[in-house]
């Protein structure tokens, strides 16, 4: 009805606009008579707008009498032809109009507006009830509404229009931001979930119209709210929607502060909506209690569509409420086929009264996800029920923090194992926090092992208190389980069993994700390193399927670098989690080095590691060179701390890391040659060293057998020569195989010409042609469609051609686009994969061929050795190897230490059969590990240092020698368990010295001591051992028995007189070898003569009578230099081992400038003089009885040494060993020939001196002065040389004294020995003259016995004239 034909005058219309608002469009205006009390009527004007009706007075100025929204209408009754009664929520309005047509017009307008605002809904449904007499009138209206073309719905089903209408109905302000968010964000995401958190910033009242619109909206099917407290008004509106909407399917109100009354009202709302489509209900985190859930349960049984997803976790349920719920679920026949997700976690369900829940689970059902975590329900009872009802579909089973009711002495219920062995779909099993004894754990693992239906199972056994019993079960089962791809055994107290467990885990070929965190917290340092080494071997295994490793929250500190150093060359791990280990900036530095060469890692998690700005900068520098890492979450804990101390550097480094990660997501750059160079550097260098060693041995045999007759020998020689040529050519095997067929696939200047590139280029041209044709056809189709839709416009002349011509430029694609996509993106991906496969094949072929060469060379070596044995000749010494190694040494220095000589001998004595493909692979794996940085030596951990204190000062077995120090595995490593035992396997062997009769010299020396000392064997001369008590260290001793046994072979060939002379030296006093603080950076080096090695590996003895050279005393810096202590031989170690009880240690956490020092206690001069006088008397007595010859052979003469006072009040002893420059023992060839007999004598002397001797007392000074604090070394490993392992910390109060090796003194020397005041220089030279040969052996022992816990020691030495030379008597 237009305004011109309206019955309402224009003046009144203007007045009405002034009342209701001029912005509101008036659609219908009718004069009506409003019936009031009885038959009384009043003239009014009915004004209809798009969503509201107004009743105003019919006079000017008009006045608003009544208004109502169309949504308030509860019913319309038209019983009389011109009467219309409108019922609303507040009142009932009866109006009389001029004609029935006016009534129909009003109703038609209201229905049309409702249909336009709420498309998809019938106006009759919105108005609840429409009654018209006769009924044909309503039918005609319905036909009118249906015939009207419904305009296209707006975004999200026209939500914005509905929201505006609802705001008008409820009287709330219309928020344009709500309309924008829905029309833009929700439309873009194409989501059907209305999330109240998106509008949580608004007032709670503003949420009411948003929710109310869902009653009519047909787009949204899910209403969700999480962690948002909902007011009462909002809850009421939600209940209204539930009770009226048949479109809402999912209701998620998690942690919304709802109580029992809401659950009861929700049950009532469901009861009022028989057509409800609700099938997902999530009320987790709301204390609904048993009453509320019981009310809901009744309606769950009546839901027309059944329940698919039910989450009632943390709703304060008890077993009573769960049983009620289970009964209702069982009562609904649809539930068995519809319910797929059931979550009752977080409710206390302990006890046995859960029969209804077990019965429900035992019925055949379709549950896929079952969560009963943290309920304390019976694990075995649940599995028994699942066995009967949930085998077919159950995929996710979360039973963490439940209780296994198995008791000791009783068998595990068979149903427990049967469930895991019979399940058809299990993918994730979570039993974390459930205390599992070995029996149920074994049943679980065996059940999974024998289930061939399951694949890719994730098993979470974290915090199950498995401990040793569980570890043993895992060791016995895990290797054979084929269907576990993810295993979490963190926080299980497996510290003592991890070493063995990891070995068994490495045998499993299905585990791709492994979590071991929180199992190292209570682990001793001596047990930690073997575990990490085994873990490194596991991830380095070529066949290892492991892709993800987690060591989170293990508090490994710097020990985690053992794992990090293995990441650089690792090719299997794609994700590593080392967070919570406190590795510090040094760990970040090592991680940075690994990331620079790693091309496999995609995710690294490294928070909670005490990283500062410097560590972040190191990682940023490394990320610049890494193009493959994609995900490295910002370490929030460390970053927040670093930002407080150094914000600029930290922010800059973090920004760079994020930029490089973004670059890695966008770029396809792959350093193809980097992986090849890494493979070449590791494999080729390691393999070639092994081939070179065996080639040297074969070449020695070739040289010796070249002139021998015999066809067989000559044929073997020719075969060996051919093998040697192959071995030489194998050096270039990998490069030639990798580059075969031309250059690499991609160079620095881009792609090189190759068949693949040519094919891609031709393909690009073909694709471009096809694309152009498709685009032209598309343009033609568009223009045709436009002509069909707008034919009148398109009839104009030339418009079609103009449109096609104008669109041609816009629809074309640059010709280089397809080519760039194919060549620079897809092509690079293809070539990268080809390069990766090519390197894999080349490495495989090279490895197999080298294995064959090694095997052939080994057989050839054995054949040539057999020819020697048949000819009755001794095998020549492989001096060529030593000469070759010696020629390489002068690059660094021109002399070889005793330690290095022993190492050369050890390599010589390796049997050729040890050089096998297996040992080669071990060497390669060791080479792939980055050595531990020397920087760690500067750090000291007192707890770790104390763990290295030996209980017995005895020799560990020889085969374990240097297992930790050597990186290349020439000899297969022993099980790490043996390294934990501090007991020697020959401990109970009888001591040799107790079976021998003392010689005359020994008896003479023994007569001097007191009778008490003779009886108990524990007390010697009064002054013996005083200084050693305060100066000598007690350290862990490595085995040297192999050398003493070799020395014994010389004893068997010597005469009886020589035997007696050696025995006399065994009973004499010992010379305490004192060392000075040398200024040299390396320990003293001893030149050795070349002798044929003993079959038992005896150490070559140095010549006694070789030239002496004074060495410069050195001042050790606390940060860079090391002090080497001279140790006692094995014989004395064994005799003294049981007397030594404790070893004291001191903390070295102070600054390096205040270095700790070992020193000799400064004693009073009177006591020294008395001790010296007594010693001289004993020496004179011995000389008279034994004669000059015996005296010259006896080592009972006292030796004096000068001491240098240290800062701490102790004395630092000086030592001036001779340093001959010729490695064969003499400076000239003439001297070399003359020294040979003396060299033999020296060898025999050393052999005899290393035999066991009886223990001697160690007396303490009555009033000792304060000793300098001992130096405690700081870190287990060095980076310079694997052999330079310093001493372990020891007590200054216990000393082990070595027997003395001296040359025969001259008369002047003997006179000098009795002199009361020797000069300092003569004194030091005497020590040097008599002890340098002994020191060579002792120095090597010192090297082998040094603990892995030691680091550099440093101290200040006084070079000023304040140094005071003291006299001491050492016996």
Curated annotation (Swiss-Prot):
Coiled coil, from the record: 710-734
Region (Necessary for localization at the cell membrane): 1055-1089
GO biological process terms held by the UniProt record: actin filament network formation; actin filament organization; barbed-end actin filament uncapping; cell migration; lamellipodium assembly; macropinocytosis; negative regulation of barbed-end actin filament capping; positive regulation of actin filament polymerization
MF-aspect GO terms: protein-containing complex binding
This protein's record includes keyword RNA-binding: no
Region annotation (Inhibits capping activity of CAPZA2) ranges: 958-1082
Basic and acidic residues bias (residue ranges): 977-986, 1036-1061, 1106-1130, 1139-1148, 1231-1243, 1340-1353
Protein localization: Cytoplasm; Cytoplasm, Cytoskeleton; Cell membrane; Cell projection, Lamellipodium
PTM annotation (N-acetylmethionine): residues: 1
Gene Ontology cellular component annotations, sorted alphabetically: cell leading edge; cytosol; extracellular exosome; filamentous actin; lamellipodium; macropinosome; nuclear speck; plasma membrane
Tissue expr: Expressed in lung, placenta, small intestine, liver, thymus, colon, skeletal muscle, heart and brain. Higher expression in kidney.
LRR repeat residue intervals: 245-269, 275-298, 304-327, 336-363, 391-418, 423-447, 481-506, 543-566, 570-593, 654-678, 958-981
Sequence ranges of Polar residues compositional bias: 1190-1199, 1313-1326
Ranges of compositional bias, category Low complexity: 1244-1265
Region (Disordered): 957-1000, 1036-1159, 1172-1371
Phosphothreonine: residues bearing it: 916, 1228
Residues where Phosphoserine is found: 122, 968, 1067, 1094, 1280, 1288, 1291, 1315, 1324, 1331, 1360
Superkingdom field: Eukaryota
Any Pfam family matching the protein: Carm_PH
Subunit structure: Homodimer. Interacts (via C-terminus) with heterodimer capping protein (CP); this interaction uncaps barbed ends capped by CP, enhances barbed-end actin polymerization and promotes lamellipodial formation and cell migration. Interacts with heterodimer capping protein (CP). Interacts with MYO1E. Interacts with TRIO.
Domain notes: The C-terminus is necessary for localization to the cell membrane.
Similarity comment: family membership: Belongs to the CARMIL family.
Protein name, entry field: F-actin-uncapping protein LRRC16A
Organism annotation: Homo sapiens
